[in-house]
Amino acid sequence: MNDLLSRQMISGENATISQLLMKQGAVVPRHSHVNEQYSWILSGSLKFIFDDREILVGAGEVLLIPAHVPHGAVALEDTVDVDFFAPRREDWIRKEDSYLRG
């Protein structure tokens, strides 16, 4: 996707799962989507940025982001993040993910 972020994903009829490999300093710009999102950090840590707060999520932790909530993230170190989305990410399936491509 860019020099600091790569993604693998698979979608079924009702959900999408993606694995993001993020190098330290990688940024996911502020965005929102119709999907509920569960972010499970396998290694490393991310700082999620919301309108009213920031949340640090480290290895072994999971964060739920409700649908339509604007958010962004910064990798505080090299990070492996598995994201679960429901319903599935139709925008990603249509390759409408330019905000991640930097």
Spans of features found by a protein language model:
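A short glycine-rich, His/Asp/Glu-containing loop-to-beta-strand
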Residues: 1-29
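Double-stranded beta-helix
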Residues: 2, 16, 74-102
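Structural motif
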Residues: 16, 45-47, 54, 70, ...
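Short beta-strand segments in beta-sandwich/barrel cores
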Residues: 18, 27-28, 44-49, 63
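Short, conserved beta-strand element in jelly-roll/cupin
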Residues: 21-23, 33-48
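A cytosolic small-molecule/anion-sensing beta-strand core signal
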Residues: 42-43, 58-59, 77
